[in-house]
Amino acid sequence: MRADMSVTSMLDREVYVYAEVDKLIGLPAGTAKRWINGYERGGKDHPPILRVTPGATPWVTWGEFVETRMLAEYRDRRKVPIVRQRAAIEELRARFNLRYPLAHLRPFLSTHERDLTMGGEEIGLPDAEVTIRTGQALLGDARWLASIATPGRDEVGEAVIVELPVDKAFPEIVINPSRYSGQPTFVGRRVSPVTIAQMVDGGEEREDLAADYGLSLKQIQDAIDYTKKYRLARLVAA
């Protein structure tokens, strides 16, 4: 990434293809594309949850990746109709005037400990008045992630997410689009946990790897466990 690239353009930076997003977040194959770009089934088009309209590009921007990661935290997403989820995202986008509302910190801070409400007419639903339990719950479920993500500032001072932990269980393994081509790395390091796990699998001593790469033995184990959990490489090391 160019040194003069703004945080805003970072959110618009094309970083991944859909299959990579599924793998990095741990989603079933095809999920990221459905959420981000919509899908067609039985001759019927289903609009995206996250994009305003479907696009022809095979690429996913950093802002879209962050939003997909946040949506993956929504515990009721299998119960709540897609139309309600999409409406909640649309309302957040309009209310905060943000292209990627789930990639900015302001919506998470603005709705903390209070309801976000909207009228049914605003989102095209028959309810006379809808409390956005969907939007509120989505923000609530993902708030832990927003609270520990690394923020940056855009040119107007908005706080946006520039680095995310890959998993609550592995807080020291992070994803940043400006480091290691957006692939997982350790905080403050440029080595991939997958590379570390593969070297252990290849017979390298953990103590030697820890010394060579400035990692703790716990981080070495985290690399192995993370790589196994997300099926990022074939491993036999325990």
UniProtKB/Swiss-Prot annotation:
<dbReference type="InterPro" id="IPR017277">
    <property type="entry name" value="VapB45-like"/>
</dbReference>
<dbReference type="Pfam" id="PF04255">
    <property type="entry name" value="DUF433"/>
</dbReference>
<protein>
    <recommendedName>
        <fullName>Uncharacterized protein Rv2308</fullName>
    </recommendedName>
</protein>
<dbReference type="InterPro" id="IPR007367">
    <property type="entry name" value="DUF433"/>
</dbReference>
<dbReference type="InterPro" id="IPR009057">
    <property type="entry name" value="Homeodomain-like_sf"/>
</dbReference>
<dbReference type="InterPro" id="IPR036388">
    <property type="entry name" value="WH-like_DNA-bd_sf"/>
</dbReference>
